[in-house]
């Protein structure tokens, strides 16, 4: 190699290193997990089968990092035990063929520095029941971003993430917790506990829950891991209360009986431009029949249909008993731009502080509500006032907590955007499609077999939930990726790469800014339309950078339309008989899109 080439290579390496310092996880990654690096530059690992474990399995692929996970197959992976994802992993669910990847039966836990995209985790009670059985959860980690994932069917909470650093959950669906699947405490049906030390929850769909939709965690557990936060040097928090900063915006809550509440122990929470829509379970009241809590129709609206949040005071019963210094404290809130809609169609924009209620234990001064702060944990930068001999801080914040880089829509626009794009929407399954139609029409197709409450289900069978035996599968044809670098041959050829040289996947030749490897450019291209469509029409937009690429003919599973518009897929035998699920051999697949377009093709199972 001559000196000129050496200097050119060194310059390229330096440019990439500088770019990586502030490179988004992918174009459209936003919030406090925006700059997670995952497995970038790591080993490319293919998932080649739907087995629970062993060579080619998803479990084997994620057991250690630094790795980038791509998929040669699609369908349901029937887990046989809880799955823990190693540190420094990127999971590119969008690289799977139709119908995408669903994980079932056990809990999935991410690790430090994880990027997880376009994946479905639908746990269920069929194989395992325990009181901690979330579909997914994690705490005490640094650097996690979930993008366009679908979570459902949990025994405890659907998706709980708190006491993590630099976290984002964006464009996900969190719905249909199981109310009476066998939890020792009886009826559960919870959405999630959300919090963190710079944590973002934006553009998510939260639906069909009995409670915790979501519950804000606050600083009640006294976690001190905030010193590992990537932004600690910027903020220099003195304690966990100051470090607890949560941004909750542009989410849609539908038929969630216990909407937002919590925040005990202190912290800062933004609740901005969310849409709260009551559902059919809000027209019921609870009663007990044969020792089981059930819902019965009353024809009256429940009183909490327009609640924005309930501010919770920390006590010995809801907080860590080893941290009494947080007792009597609440979080502080910035609340703006939120819309409510009742079951009778009454819409109230900017409900905001008129929709806030409070636990007992707060203080009032000049018609303002205050939280106790006896130990001055909020710090001298926050004005304190002595009320009844107790040092207190105002609960209402005039300035929002840190938001990170974030796109913001109005609440009305967020409602439309979330319904069109949230969840694993590249190949939206019938479950997410149903959620969105129910939210749009104010209905619930199913009810709990025990509770009898519309939308508030008890078991997976209540909604005829799919399994590995009833859900379609898919695989890549031979010759799709000759060099096994994660990029299809046709795409490599169209973009000037070598389909016989695996090393070019992890170089930066396609991205003129040096942000993304060629493999990342390919993977991001698969969902670029979805990301751009979701972020369009914003009141506050992020100027996202998308590297240029060329689309080869015939590589898309669908024609060039937004795959998130897919609303229904049905299968037929070759003689035209409607099938409940694809059969072994050749099937005719019929795809119906929201714009009325119908496409058919043949698929092999």
Task: Place the predicted regions along the sequence by residue.
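Extracellular calcium-associated, cysteine-rich motifs in secreted modular proteins
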Residues: 463-552
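Extracellular beta-rich repeat passengers
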Residues: 215-220, 229, 241-462
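Acidic Gly/Asp/Thr-rich repetitive segments characteristic of extracellular carbohydrate-active
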Residues: 24-69, 504, 572-579
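Residue-level detector of functionally pivotal "anchor" positions at catalytic/ligand-binding pockets or at interdomain
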Residues: 549-575
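Right-handed parallel beta-helix
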Residues: 88-93, 112-123, 140-153, 165-184, ...
């Amino acid at each position: 190699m001559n000196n000129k080439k050496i200097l050119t290579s060194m310059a390229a390496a330096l440019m990439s290193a500088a770019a990586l310092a502030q490179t988004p996880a992918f174009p459209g990654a936003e919030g406090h997990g925006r700059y997670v690096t995952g497995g970038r530059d790591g080993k490319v690992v293919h998932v080649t089968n739907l087995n629970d474990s062993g060579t080619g399995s998803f479990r084997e692929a994620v057991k250690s990092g630094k790795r980038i996970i791509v998929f040669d197959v699609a369908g349901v992976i029937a887990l046989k035990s809880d799955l823990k994802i190693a540190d420094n992993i990127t999971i590119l669910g969008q690289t799977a063929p139709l119908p995408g990847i669903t994980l079932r039966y056990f809990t999935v836990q991410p690790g430090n520095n994880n990027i997880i995209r376009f994946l479905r985790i639908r746990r269920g009670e069929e194989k395992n029941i325990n009181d901690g059985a979330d579909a997914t959860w994690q705490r005490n980690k640094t650097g996690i971003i979930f993008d366009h994932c679908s979570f459902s069917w949990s025994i405890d909470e659907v998706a709980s993430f708190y006491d993590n650093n630099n976290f984002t959950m964006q464009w996900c669906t969190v719905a249909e917790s199981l109310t009476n699947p066998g939890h020792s405490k009886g009826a559960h049906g919870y959405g999630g506990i959300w919090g963190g030390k710079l944590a973002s929850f934006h553009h998510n769909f939260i639906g069909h829950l009995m409670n915790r939709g979501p519950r804000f965690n606050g600083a009640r557990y006294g976690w001190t891991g905030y010193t590992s936060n990537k932004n600690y040097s910027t903020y220099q928090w003195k304690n966990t209360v100051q470090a607890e900063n949560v941004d909750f915006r542009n989410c849609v809550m539908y038929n969630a009986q216990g909407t937002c509440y919590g925040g005990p122990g202190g912290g800062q929470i933004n609740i901005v431009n969310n849409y709260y829509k009551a559902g059919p379970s809000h027209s019921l009241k609870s009663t007990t029949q044969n020792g089981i809590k059930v819902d019965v129709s009353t024809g009256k609206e429940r009183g909490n249909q327009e609640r924005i949040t309930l501010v919770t005071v920390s006590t010995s019963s809801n907080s860590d008993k080893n941290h009494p210094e947080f007792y009597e404290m609440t979080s502080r809130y910035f609340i703006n731009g939120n819309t409510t809609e009742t079951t009778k169609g009454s819409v109230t924009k900017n409900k905001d502080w008129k929709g806030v209620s409070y636990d007992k234990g707060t203080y009032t001064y000049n018609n303002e509500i205050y939280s106790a702060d006896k130990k001055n944990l909020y710090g001298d930068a926050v004005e304190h006032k002595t009320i009844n001999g107790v040092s207190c801080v105002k609960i209402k914040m005039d300035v929002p907590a840190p938001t990170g880089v974030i796109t913001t829509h109005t609440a009305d626009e967020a409602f439309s955007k979330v319904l069109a794009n949230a969840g694993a929407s590249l190949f939206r399954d019938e479950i997410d499609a149903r959620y969105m139609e129910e939210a749009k029409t104010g209905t619930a197709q199913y009810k709990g077999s025990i509770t009898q409450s519309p939308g508030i289900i008890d078991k997976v069978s209540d909604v005829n939930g799919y399994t590995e035996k009833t859900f379609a599968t898919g695989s890549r044809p031979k010759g799709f990726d000759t060099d096994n670098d994660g990029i299809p041959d046709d795409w490599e050829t169209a973009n000037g790469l070598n389909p016989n040289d695996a090393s070019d996947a992890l170089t930066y030749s396609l991205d003129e800014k040096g942000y993304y490897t060629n493999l990342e450019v390919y993977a991001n291209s698969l969902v670029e339309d979805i990301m751009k469509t979701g972020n369009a029409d914003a009141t506050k937009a992020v100027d996202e950078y998308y590297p240029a690429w060329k689309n080869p003919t015939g590589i898309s599973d669908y024609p060039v339309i937004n795959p998130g518009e897919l609303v229904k897929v049905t299968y037929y035998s070759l003689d035209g008989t409607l099938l409940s699920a694809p059969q072994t051999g050749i099937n005719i697949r019929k795809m119906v899109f929201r714009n009325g377009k119908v496409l058919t093709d043949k698929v092999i199972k």
